[in-house]
Amino acid sequence: MQTVWKFPLQIGGVWEVEMPSHAEILSLALQGDDLFFWARVETRNGVVRRRFLVVGTGHEIPHYAEKFLGTVHLKNGLVFHAFEI
């Protein structure tokens, strides 16, 4: 069955998230003060670990940052950018 699941991310640093294989990331946003992304998943697929990086504006983006996911603006004015690595 295909459905949309919500996954938490932390701001700053590299994070591993377990999710069904071949999940398609749809969007990234703040919900309250927390960062999440939403993905279309096939619930019958096996689980894999995927890695994500969240960096602030002006911080170095490593060469291995493969896919840009989106940008979020915090209430305090800071801006962060999420990548899959």
Predicted regions and their residues:
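Helix N-cap motif at beta-to-alpha junctions
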Residues: 40-46
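Helix-rich interaction surfaces within compact, conserved domain-sized segments
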Residues: 47-85
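Short, well-ordered beta-strand micro-motif
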Residues: 38-40, 84
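Extracellular interaction modules
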Residues: 31-38, 77
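N-terminal domain-onset segments
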Residues: 1-34, 43, 51, 60-67
